[in-house]
Each structure stands twice: as C-alpha cells, then as structure tokens.
From Swiss-Prot:
Membrane topology reported for the UniProt record: Single-pass membrane protein
Subcellular location: Mitochondrion; Membrane
Biased composition (Gly residues): 322-342
InterPro entries: SNase_OB-fold_sf, Staphylococal_nuclease_OB-fold
Gene name of the record: LCL3
Record's compositionally biased regions (Polar residues): 61-75
Taxonomic path: Eukaryota, Fungi, Dikarya, Ascomycota, Pezizomycotina
Major subcellular location class: mitochondrion
Biased composition (Low complexity): 15-24
GO molecular function: endonuclease activity; metal ion binding
Tagged with keyword DNA-binding: no
Protein name as annotated: Probable endonuclease LCL3
Family that this chain belongs to: Belongs to the LCL3 family.
Chain ranges passing through the membrane: 93-109
Length: 342
C-alpha cells in the first residue's frame, strides 16, 4: 500500500509540474495583455482633491502638459521660448537686416529715379540745376517749346518694350500727362497767336524744331518754372548717325539761324556763363553767314523776336488805352520768362 501511495504520487508529480508550468504560461500571457492595455491608455492626469488643495508636482504637471486643460493660456508656448535669444541669433538677425535694407534701398531708388512726373508743375525744386528729366517728345508747340512724356530710367526701366511701359500716341491719352518745356537761352520767331500776326521765319523755325525733336528721346536739365506752368531747361538729343554724341538743341537752333540769343533785363537762364558765351558765338557765326532769319538782317524792316514782342506790346497797349481792350492778352507775351508764352 505504501508503495502504491508513493508510486502514485511519483507518477502524478510530473503531471502536476506540467500543470504548474501551464498555469505560469497563462499568467505570463495575462500579464502581457495587462501591460499592453496599460500602454494603450491615455496618460493619467491627477487632480487635486479640492480647490483648496495646495499645488503639488502632479498638479503642476497636469496644468502645463494636459492638452485638455481649459485654463491653459493661448500664449503659453510663446512665453515658453527665449525670443530675445532668437532675435539676437546671427542666423536670424543678418537676413532680417539685409531684407529690410534692401526694401528701403529699392523704395529710395524708385522715389528718386523711377517715379514718373506727369506735369511741369509736379517737378520738385530739388530738380532745378541738379537733376535731369528723360523722356520722349510728343508735340512741338512753337519754335522754342515742346511737350515731353517723362520716361524715368529709359529702356533700362522697361520703357518702350514692356507692355505696361508704353508712351501713349493718342492726343486724348496724353492730356495732363506731359511736361511743357521751354528751351533756355534762345528766342525763336513767334507763330500767330492772341490775335498777333506771324513773325517772318516763325513757321520755318517751328518746322525745323519739329523735324529735329518730334518722337525723339531727349534729356532736359531744368532750371525753373515760369508763370505759364512750363519748365525752362537746356535740352539734349542724340541723333543718327552720331548717337554717342549729345547735341544741345538750343545751340543747334542758333547755328541754323532759327533763333536768337534771348535778350532781357532779367530772368534769363543759360545754364552757366560758359554756355551763354557759346550761344553768343553761335549766333554771331549764323549772322555773318546769313543763315535762317539772319538773311537780310541789315535791311529795313527786319526785327528780332524780342523787337517783335516789344512792338506788339506797344500796339496792344495803345489799343487798350483807346478802349480796344486788347492790352490784357498782349501783355502776357511780354511778361513770359525767356520770351512770350509760345
């Protein structure tokens, strides 16, 4: 019997060990399942037992890290960064300074060199005797004045070849968009206006200036404005085949005998004493050769543009005194800078 007891016990022992091993394996599986479930759970947030509970580490952690915290401020992430250090970082500071400086430089260049001036009355006094105006001649009104469409920067700024940088050709589109320029230092014969008859060679002078300047690109150096809204300026043009040489338009008119040096007691602009002497030498040369209006200038009845203006002013003054009422208009021609209005 004892042998049977111990034998049966010895036979069951392996089975019991096997069962124990199976139970241990089952426990391990259950532990793994529990651990996996714990890992899948969202992080625990500990709450204080009551509002009067003093702040603790867990509460602080919850207040700063819990995404569902309704008391979290919108600027928490902003104040958490060291922005002073970020701004002082050369990797951020240098590009910012370069970008800001580049924008300010472009604005300055545009204001000084690329901003278009529509009318002579819009020209800043800082231009006079210091700056120049570049543009295309759109019309010639008389033998010594014309209108120019300002094209700052020329072709380098896109004028004449970019679609939005075209010079208008229609007279309606040019209204109030051109600069009225009076050639400095010269006086051309007067066309008929204000009821005055045309002066000899006035049409010839107008035709000469039209052929010389119309639709050409010119550069004007302004000196001042007159009372008619025109700007008195020395004008240069480049003409084929000598496109690399600038030609003084006023000087060329004097050489061709189509104008005289402007004579007045005050208000004359030449652009310097050297230019005035050059103008007078050119006039003297044309006078000796009898060019243009100087043909027969020694004969009776010949008069210069200045003498013509003075004579017309006297005639209109006599009419005004006699009650004709024509002196008011006639006086405009005498008061103009560098001659009459036209």
């Amino acid at each position: 019997m004892r042998w049977l007891f111990w034998s049966s016990g010895s036979q069951q022992a392996p089975n019991s060990n096997k069962d124990n091993n199976n139970n241990n394996d089952g426990d391990d599986d259950n532990n793994n399942i529990i651990i996996n479930n714990i890992n899948r759970r969202p992080p625990l947030t500990l709450e204080c037992p009551s509002p009067s509970h003093p702040p603790c580490a867990s509460c602080s952690t919850k207040a700063t890290t819990s995404p569902s915290n309704p008391k979290r401020g919108w600027n928490t992430s902003l104040t958490a960064r060291d922005w002073a250090g970020e701004f002082k970082d050369p990797r951020n500071l240098i590009p910012t300074l370069l970008l800001t400086g580049g924008i300010l430089f472009c604005v300055r260049i545009h204001r000084q060199y690329l901003r278009r001036i529509p009318l002579a009355t819009n020209i800043s006094p800082t231009y006079f005797h210091k700056r120049s105006l570049f543009g295309r001649v759109t019309s010639v009104g008389d033998g010594d004045n014309f209108r120019m469409y300002h094209t700052p920067g020329g072709r380098l700024a896109g004028w004449e070849w970019l679609p939005f940088r075209r010079v208008p050709r229609v007279k309606k589109e040019l209204k109030d968009r051109t600069i009225h320029i009076r050639l400095a230092g010269i006086d051309a014969p007067e066309l008929p206006h204000f009821g005055r008859p045309a002066q000899p060679y006035s049409h010839a002078a107008h035709t000469w200036l039209t052929n010389y300047l119309l639709n050409k690109r010119v550069r004007a150096f302004p000196y001042r404005q007159d009372q008619y809204g025109r700007v008195v300026a020395t004008v240069y043009v480049r003409r084929f085949p000598w496109i690399f040489l600038r030609r003084d338009v006023g000087l060329q008119m004097l050489r061709a005998g189509m104008a005289t040096v402007y004579e007045a007691k005050s208000g004359v602009e030449f652009g310097g004493e050297g230019k005035e002497s050059k103008y007078r030498r050119a006039e003297e040369m044309a006078k000796r050769r009898g060019r243009g209006l100087w043909k027969g200038w020694k004969g009776a009845g010949w008069e210069s543009p200045r003498e013509y203006k003075n004579r017309m002013a006297g005639v209109e003054g006599e009419r005004a005194a006699a009650g004709g009422g024509g002196g008011g208009v006639g006086g405009m021609g005498e008061l103009g800078v560098n001659g009459g209005k036209n």
